Amino acid sequence: MCIRDRDRKLLLLKPQTYMNESGVAVKKVKDFFKISSNQTIVIYDDLDLQVGQIKIKDTGGSGGHNGVNSIIENIGNNNFIRIRIGIGKPLEKSMTNKYVLSKFTKDESKIVNNINNLAKNIIYSIVFKSISFAMNTFNSKIQ
């Protein structure tokens, strides 16, 4: 999906690859549209944040997230903006794979729906204001 506003064009991409191969899709789109890494925003789930917590970063490592690791490996750097959305973590580490593929509870679904509605404001803030503004406005707030 492409969104235009003023002189800027925003391209929204949801890779149809497996999560741990997300980097293949991101690289193809970046190369085709000649998008630099610092103009790339990646939104992903994060086990290390509570459900509904948001953390925006302008660079960094994968934090053990296979999808982010794939992006770093495929594009050759880690200079892209990240919007991490908390999903909490299971009580037992051995249940992680099952946990990330499971459905949210009713209460969690309400929180996640609020995040989905908030996402456009976060992206708008990053693109049309600044990454600093977005981080100060949205980081660490449980929605």
Specify the residue positions occupied by each region the protein language model found:
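A hydrophobic, small-residue-rich beta->alpha segment in the mid-to-C-terminal subdomain
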Residues: F104-D107
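Nucleotide and nucleotide-moiety/phosphate-recognizing core
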Residues: R4-D58, N69, E73, N77-I83, ...
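Short-chain dehydrogenase/reductase
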Residues: G61
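Hydrophobic alpha-helical segments within soluble ligand-binding/sensing domains
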Residues: G64-G67
